[in-house]
Amino acid sequence: MAKEVRFSEDARTRMQAGIDKLADAVKTTIGPKGRNVVLEQSYGTPTITNDGVTIAKAVELDDHYENMGAKLVTEAASKTNDVAGDGTTTATVLTQAIVNEGLKNVTAGANPVGIRSGIEKATAAAVAGLNKNSHEVEDSSSIQQIASISAANEEIGKLIADAMEKVGHDGVITIEESKGIETELDVVEGMQFDRGYMSQYFVTDNDKMETNLDNPYLLITDQKIGNIQDILPVLQSVVEQGRSLLIIADDITGEALPTLVLNKLRGTFNVAAVKAPGFGDRRKAQLQDIAILTGATVVTEDLGLQLKDVTIDQLGQANRVTITKDKTTIVEGKGDKTALADRIKSIRQEIDSTTSDFDREKLQERLAKLAGGVAVVRVGAATETELKEKKYRIEDALNATRAAVEEGFVAGGGTAFVNIIPEVKKVADSLQGDVATGARIVLRALEEPLRQIVENAGLEGSVIAQRAKSEKPEVGFNAATGEWVNMIDAGIVDPTKVTRSALQNAASVSAMILTTEAVVAELPKKDAPAAPNAGGMPGMM
């Protein structure tokens, strides 16, 4: 396929057009008075959302150069989402602001490499300022405030605060669709461990890259599975019952894994496989924990058990299993309750008797997994469209809350960025030439989230941003009520991790775009010429 190469200003201008198209769609959603965006689906009803990364991923532009620009902004949003779980719209707004201001200076003759250096120095100063102004999460009310702000819904905030109170800050919280219209919280027995699917072909939900197994059997073994014939008898038994199967094994090698994947893709049976958690003796203990939770027998040579002899009675069962690329969550294992209680009691006794801090920590992790349970938020809504939108909001709120527990929180509504402007200005004033220009670009960009929040509320962003700079620290503009308040006292807060990640990723992607000197793209396909008109056929006798 032939390629086209564009250079310098021409290349950057085309990419900038794509950045603006994507960012203009995403930034309408920021703040308490942000709007929704409707996304067309290849089938079914459109999705309505205000989730920045979902909108960004849905944008595909016809022009190759514009599309590359849009995809680079999507990268900033996605990275922020991966690290902090929220803040994708903020990352997009900051990226657009830095790129647009930076391109003006590059076009005017500034050196992009110097500008990049200034952006990096100013970002480092801004991050230090955010960390200095951060407050620790101390109680359930802080959690509720953060979740409420992220979801723009007080009921959702209360729900997530309740869930965290019941299973702990590090507890497992999953989000499922309810059959009714009410959104409820339920705490069930379950556990999570740090192992993901062995192959992405096991994925059942391509949007979230998750594998969901309803009412599955579980085959648990500390052995390697290298030959599909070893597990064929038990596979056939599972297929006959029309159930799905989760295999937890030391490893699946040789032709066994491709055979499982092929049969999954053909629809012969629904299967997924993950590696066993832990190592050595701890692996054996964790496998036994999972077995007791689900009512399985661990297939191990220590007990003289072979894979080829496994029967369906030795498999575990659960109500639901969710697997991502790095975690597996088992919800409502169907094991014996008495055996589970005995196992928990045994682990507690080991914790009391051990003299090793490391062993105690690992035992406490196992205890939390077994005894803590899983909080299930069942999302209800009147329509499919509302259900999806609500689910996105709850996921964002949960991610934001976890981020706040991890690194604390800062004043929300764009106020945290305005509060660190004096510190970043000190750095900018100490620099020279194009490096100083780069730092001042970040200075101006720090006002942009507040401006956009205010403009989405129908007010003049520049006027509010100017006043915000002269206010006391943590005093900001509440766009929901139109009042100036202490943002911390009013419960308008953002997780430090989300705010920091949004700025760092925006600065990183923007610096790459500004230092781009050539862009290579495929030439647009030319339509084949229409067939010539053959004219009329001669008459027939």
Swiss-Prot record:
Catalytic activity: ATP + H2O + a folded polypeptide = ADP + phosphate + an unfolded polypeptide
Keyword check for Chaperone: yes
Keywords (A to Z) from UniProt: ATP-binding, Chaperone, Cytoplasm, Isomerase, Nucleotide-binding
Compartments where located: Cytoplasm
Assigned EC number: 5.6.1.7
UniProt: ATP binding residues: T29, I30, G31, P32, D86, G87, T88, T89, T90, G413, N478, A479, A480, D494
Subunit structure: Forms a cylinder of 14 subunits composed of two heptameric rings stacked back-to-back. Interacts with the co-chaperonin GroES.
HAMAP family to which the protein is assigned, alphabetical: CH60
Role, per record: Together with its co-chaperonin GroES, plays an essential role in assisting protein folding. The GroEL-GroES system forms a nano-cage that allows encapsulation of the non-native substrate proteins and provides a physical environment optimized to promote and accelerate protein folding.
Protein name (record): Chaperonin GroEL
Organism of provenance: Oenococcus oeni (strain ATCC BAA-331 / PSU-1)
